[in-house]
């Protein structure tokens, strides 16, 4: 009964409501900001390497790595392969579309997070959708609802799913026992995650800023090797992606399993553009202008979908291995690499899944620290945070042994609720984003390092950081 209800909500959200909202808002911000994905790409790359104002402050690069740690996860492997298995090859195209359009929404939401952020007693900055919902719309109630939805999504839904996806990569090993092994792997992952979480936000930032660049670069290099070894298949694969993407039978027939719906679902799960998660990391960065971090988070969407998700799709499709009922998700990716790289392939995917899942868990819990600080109106005391982190680690343990389809559906619904709150809000505040972008570009044209003050854009609401 519960699964039927969740599935019905999912189908409604992703076959009607969210498709219109996500694509519509992406087009709106892309046009209103005059295609920043192309026009300001160079500025985004420059902003990543800027040093923070203080030695203990979070840099743009570290904020990028935390948000990318959450974006770049098991969804880049399992999500992509599942989308292709269910929606067909054309779903890859729709993942690209939602990433390109969504990157403009990511620019908007992260710029707003910077504008309305607050500085805590510990010297760190806190912000995100909850902060700009209350400051600009004067609705703390809606802000708290968003926080609760996001905590449920990330600390439980996404983390449980990441744990399941990780243990599933071991299913082909001789020692794997379906009744025992998932719980053992879940227990080990929960213990390691708990150790990092109990070290607090600084430990999370340090771990993710080390692991994310390393694993991303290695993953892309291996995918390029696989494509080069199967280069003869590439033209037909690309042709098939575009052909199925615009095949109206594939797009609309049985919409729950269509190319468009699966591409948007899994693309959104992977890159998180517009749902209000990354702004929590973006707000923590110490920068001289809010738009700088907006551009950095736009870049994070590109890294996640246009690089890493595409890498998975191409590795699988050029290999010639056809997915089947018993060969979906991570096992399909492992089989594809095994055909090209031999026994090294499955082990590489296993290692990649361990790193992807681990950094996802840490990035997700970093977000929850920010949300709990907002709900409590101050940093929660140590006992509360210790208890929350233990419960979060327990969710990681439980997720390893749960049923995959139910976990996907629950995560999709929770993610959809976040998008339904955040996207209308950033649309209402779009003029603030446009004014900040105009101020940034005006200073760039004068060959200045952009510095922001709220009076520069005649901001009516008082800001805590930029006055």
Place the predicted regions along the sequence by residue.
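Helix-loop-helix module between adjacent transmembrane segments
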Residues: 25-30, 98-123, 129-130, 134-164, ...
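Alpha-helical membrane segments and immediately flanking helix-loop junctions
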Residues: 54-86, 112-130, 134, 151, ...
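Transmembrane helix-loop junctions in multi-pass membrane proteins
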Residues: 2, 18, 32-37, 75-80, ...
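Extracellular/periplasmic helix-exit of transmembrane alpha-helices
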Residues: 30, 108-117, 222-240, 254, ...
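Membrane-interface loop-to-helix entry segments
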Residues: 21-28, 32-45, 165-170, 181-229, ...
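Flexible loop linkers connecting adjacent transmembrane helices
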Residues: 35-60, 82, 88-92, 104-137, ...
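Membrane-interface alpha-helices at helix entry/exit sites of multi-pass transporters
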Residues: 54-60, 89-97, 131-135, 139-147, ...
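N-terminal alpha-helical transmembrane segments of multi-pass membrane transport
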Residues: 1-74, 84-91, 102, 427-467
């Amino acid at each position: 009964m519960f699964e039927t209800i969740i599935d019905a909500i999912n189908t409604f959200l992703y076959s009607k409501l969210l498709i219109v909202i996500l694509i519509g808002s992406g087009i709106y911000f892309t046009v209103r900001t005059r295609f920043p994905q192309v026009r300001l790409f160079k500025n985004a790359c420059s902003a990543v390497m800027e040093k923070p104002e203080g030695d203990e402050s979070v840099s743009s690069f570290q904020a990028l790595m935390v948000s990318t740690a959450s974006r770049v996860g098991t969804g880049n492997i399992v999500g992509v392969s599942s989308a292709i298995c269910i929606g067909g090859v054309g779903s890859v195209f729709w993942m690209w579309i939602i990433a390109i359009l969504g990157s403009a929404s990511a620019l908007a939401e992260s710029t707003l997070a910077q504008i309305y952020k607050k500085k805590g007693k510990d010297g760190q900055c806190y912000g995100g959708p909850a902060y700009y919902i209350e400051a600009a719309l004067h609705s703390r109630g809606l802000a708290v609802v968003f926080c609760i939805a996001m905590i449920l999504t990330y600390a439980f839904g996404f983390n449980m799913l990441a744990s399941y996806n990780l243990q599933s990569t071991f299913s082909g090993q001789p020692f794997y026992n379906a009744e025992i092994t998932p719980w053992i792997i879940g227990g080990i992952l929960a213990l390691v995650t708990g150790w990092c979480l109990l070290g607090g936000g600084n430990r999370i930032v340090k771990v993710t800023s080390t692991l994310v660049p390393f694993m991303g670069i290695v993953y892309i290099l291996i995918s390029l090797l696989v494509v080069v070894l199967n280069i003869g298949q590439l033209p037909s694969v690309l042709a098939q992606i575009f052909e199925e993407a615009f095949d109206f039978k594939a797009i609309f027939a049985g919409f729950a399993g269509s190319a468009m719906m699966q591409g948007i679902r899994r693309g959104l799960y992977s890159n998180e553009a517009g749902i209000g998660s990354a702004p929590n990391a973006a707000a923590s960065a110490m920068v001289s202008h809010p738009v700088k971090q907006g551009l950095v988070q736009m870049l994070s969407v590109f890294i996640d979908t246009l690089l890493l998700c595409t890498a998975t799709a191409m590795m699988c499709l050029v290999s010639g291995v056809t997915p089947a009922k018993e060969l979906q998700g991570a096992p399909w990716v492992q089989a594809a690499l095994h055909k090209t790289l031999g026994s090294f392939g499955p082990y590489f995917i296993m290692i990649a899944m361990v790193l992807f899942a681990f950094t996802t868990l840490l990035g997700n819990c970093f977000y929850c620290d920010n949300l709990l600080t907002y709900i409590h109106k101050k940093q929660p005391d140590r006992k509360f945070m210790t208890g929350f982190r233990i419960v979060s680690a327990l969710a990681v343990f439980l997720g390893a042994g749960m049923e995959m389809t139910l976990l996907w559906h629950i995560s999709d619904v929770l993610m959809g609720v976040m998008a339904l709150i955040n996207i209308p809000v950033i649309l209402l505040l779009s003029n603030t984003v446009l004014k900040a972008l105009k101020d940034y570009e005006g200073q760039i044209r004068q060959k200045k390092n952009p510095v922001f003050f709220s009076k520069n854009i005649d901001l009516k609401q008082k800001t805590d950081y930029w006055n």
